[in-house]
Curated annotation (Swiss-Prot):
Keyword Transport: no
Binding site residues for ADP-alpha-D-glucose: 12
Enzyme class: transferase
Lineage start: Bacteria, Pseudomonadati, Pseudomonadota, Gammaproteobacteria, Methylococcales
Name of this protein: Glycogen synthase 2
GO molecular function (one): alpha-1,4-glucan glucosyltransferase (ADP-glucose donor) activity
Any one Gene Ontology BP term: glycogen biosynthetic process
Amino acid sequence: MHVTPELAPVAKVGGLADVVFGLGRELEIRGNHVEIILPKYDCMRYDQIWGLQRTFDDLWVPWYGGAIHCSVYFGFVHGRKCFFIEPHSQDNFFNRGAVYGFHDDIFRFAFFSRAAMEFLWKAGKNPDIIHCHDWQTALVPVYLYEIYQPMGMRHPRVCFTIHNFKHQGVTGAQVLHASGLDRPEYYFHYDRLRDNHNPHAINLMKGGIVYANFVTTVSPRYAMEAKDQGQGFGLEPTLHIHHMKYGGVVNGIDYDVWNPEIDPHIPVHFNVDTIEGKYADKKALRDRLLLADNEKPIVSFVGRLDPQKGIELIRHALFYTLGQGGQFVLLGSSPDGAINGYFWGLKRQFNDNPDCHLEIGYNEELAHLVYAGSDVMVVPSRFEPCGLTQLIAMRYGTIPVVREIGGLADTVIDKDFSHRPLHERNGYVFRDYDERGLESALGRAIACYYQYPDHFRELMKNAMRYDYSWNHPGQDYLNIYHYIRDK
């Protein structure tokens, strides 16, 4: 049973939505019964829900000493069984036109988490595993063990996955009173929910770590960085205390969506044995973006223009690529107006350059063509819990140039400096977050493209041979589920 604030494609803000969908499908393929609970947002893509109907109309969720009436709807999202919780209250928790971005987000998702648990209890559902995600549902294990287990719900175990430690749900005591956790002095304890920095605040993510039976994050390297290298944003001591139930599992990507053999968004399909088709897609990308038709490598960036993603180095990659005789393509946008404005300025600056195209915004069809038609994909992140860009790029034979951080370090093996066998090397890696570091890796990629085309082609094939589907992560999560189920 997944309890989640997001699910692709109906309520997608970030990678969390793809993880819940992809993992859920993989677990079902392996013969498990999977259900998903999420809020019934007014902004969902209802055209992606099949057979939506009200299935439970007598759910009263405790809130501020009273109760809020909720309806529960059931429907299928691409075959996944989903329950959608709709509260009927003046707060309009989920009728606001967006998933996040409101001053009371902590209360909205504290309520949703309580509603999900109340639904499981009242509907007589008794899952083996409840899998919750990020701070938005971190109170699920707290509610389970402090409220519902004493009432008799003793069977479920909880796996809590942290997709990004940066956002933790730090707040005051009021949310405890609201949700029925009525002993603030009990929860304001270092071993429970009290924030590690602010003794007058509680930390929802910390509560999830303390109360869950197992805690995962989205790559082994990021798990280590969060615990030991300052990427836990204050939760390092808590992770050390609970290190025996903590680990990392690299996310997968959806091979039905990201598959150059069947992709409907690219003109020529290809695989590792017919890689020549990639060059036709490269020409199609040039034609679409009005780039010069020449022998230069296409270096690209696809993703959010967010400080986490390394904006300064993305900009430098553009200038460096052009200076080294390459072409550069960018597809992305930022919710930050200043960042968007800066890249619009760059777009105007290079508007007449036949070797550069910046597309400010996001276009799913174009993204597929960029992945298929590019030679190199830069991912110079400041920090990166997992990263899907490099996984998709490799699926399409596009060589990743990445910073040695988080999931990037777990998935990209440097062509020149790794001790791994040659057939396992699949990209270029740099360590320091600076221009020299980026140049050291991107320069080697461009030089290999020009000077050793046969080596570059083998590197493309190496990248395509890796399996970054949900096959391995699915088994890893099943192992975790069995481990906590049997304890």
